């Protein structure tokens, strides 16, 4: 947390700062290695370690193997339910997407500040969530046109629509389809940003109350600290829910592309 004139800035946690390579550039664009890039690398490393550690095929699985199998089974079940047998082809992608978002969200909640390394939630930036959403949307488009050609546009005309309403319904459905990547990326970005701001604001109340004296500690700091614990637990739940929602919506969009409904 950054402080100016004794005040804590809840937005400082979202600042992207270069760690090294400040002078690196390509075509005039700076490509320094930032704290955001570092935490994405850490997230990918954690995901890789998690998967490698659980790739054993013991007859009696250990806790690590059981955890990996539980996550893969959960995503595979979701794909089978939402898409059907063909959903199995896309399970690796949706699983990777789900686990990356989940681990990135949780990494941003880790109390690494006690050892001098400030946590950074990469999913609190629209550039990251937007790219993930665009990748998913691009896959949906490729799958849809690859399987159905121009018949893919029939997705935007619900079965049984009266002929005179087709132009209007087509435009409405097409518009709702095109805003999917924006809503998908924006939802995750807003959820992670709002929760983290609230936690920092409450932390500021706690610290400023302590600095103000004993009476303020009792009136402000203690209630804020208790509330902050509750919000932190809720935010951990939000981390999992948002990863699930992102993966769920991706599977539903893939179902539209595959089954045209």
UniProtKB/Swiss-Prot annotation:
One GO location term (cellular component): plasma membrane
InterPro entries assigned: ATP_synth_F0_asu, ATP_synth_F0_asu_bact/mt, F0_ATP_A_sf
Gene Ontology molecular function terms on file: proton-transporting ATP synthase activity, rotational mechanism
Xref: NCBIfam families: ATP_synt_6_or_A, PRK05815.2-4
UniProt entry tagged with the keyword Signal: no
Organism, scientific name: Rhizorhabdus wittichii (strain DSM 6014 / CCUG 31198 / JCM 15750 / NBRC 105917 / EY 4224 / RW1)
Keyword set, alphabetical order: ATP synthesis, Cell inner membrane, Cell membrane, CF(0), Hydrogen ion transport, Ion transport, Membrane, Transmembrane, Transmembrane helix, Transport
Gene name of the record: atpB
CDD domains: ATP-synt_Fo_a_6
UniProt feature coiled coil, ranges: none
Xref: SUPFAM superfamilies: F1F0 ATP synthase subunit A
Family: Belongs to the ATPase A chain family.
PANTHER family the UniProt entry points to: ATP SYNTHASE SUBUNIT A (PTHR11410:SF0)
Function: Key component of the proton channel; it plays a direct role in the translocation of protons across the membrane.
Record's protein name: ATP synthase subunit a
Location relative to the cell: Cell inner membrane
Membrane topology: Multi-pass membrane protein
Subunit structure as annotated in this protein's UniProt entry: F-type ATPases have 2 components, CF(1) - the catalytic core - and CF(0) - the membrane proton channel. CF(1) has five subunits: alpha(3), beta(3), gamma(1), delta(1), epsilon(1). CF(0) has three main subunits: a(1), b(2) and c(9-12). The alpha and beta chains form an alternating ring which encloses part of the gamma chain. CF(1) is attached to CF(0) by a central stalk formed by the gamma and epsilon chains, while a peripheral stalk is formed by the delta and b chains.
Transmembrane segments: 31-51, 64-84, 97-117, 126-146, 166-188, 201-223, 235-255
Pfam families (UniProt xref): ATP-synt_A
């Amino acid at each position: 947390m950054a402080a100016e004139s004794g005040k804590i800035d809840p937005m400082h946690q979202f600042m992207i700062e270069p760690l090294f390579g400040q002078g690196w550039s390509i075509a005039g664009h700076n490509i320094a290695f930032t704290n955001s890039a570092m935490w994405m690398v850490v997230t990918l490393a954690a995901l890789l370690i998690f998967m490698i550690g659980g790739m054993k095929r013991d007859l009696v699985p250990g806790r690590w193997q059981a955890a990996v199998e539980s996550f893969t089974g959960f995503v595979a079940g979701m794909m089978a339910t939402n898409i059907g047998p063909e959903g199995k082809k896309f399970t690796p992608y949706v699983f990777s997407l789900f686990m990356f978002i989940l681990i990135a969200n949780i990494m941003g909640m880790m109390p690494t500040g006690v050892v001098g390394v400030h946590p950074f939630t990469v999913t609190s930036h629209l550039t990251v969530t937007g790219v993930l959403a665009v990748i998913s949307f691009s896959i949906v488009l490729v799958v849809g046109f690859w399987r159905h050609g121009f018949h893919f546009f029939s997705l935007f005309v619900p079965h049984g629509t009266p002929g005179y309403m087709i132009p209007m319904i087509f435009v409405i459905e097409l518009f709702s389809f095109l805003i999917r990547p924006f809503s998908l990326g924006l939802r995750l970005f807003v959820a992670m940003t709002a929760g983290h701001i609230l936690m920092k604001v409450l932390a500021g109340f706690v610290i400023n109350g302590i600095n103000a004296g004993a009476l303020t500690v009792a009136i402000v700091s203690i209630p804020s600290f208790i509330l902050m614990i509750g919000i932190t637990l809720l935010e951990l739940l939000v981390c999992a829910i948002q990863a699930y929602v992102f993966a769920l919506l991706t599977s539903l969009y893939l179902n539209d592309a595959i089954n045209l409904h």
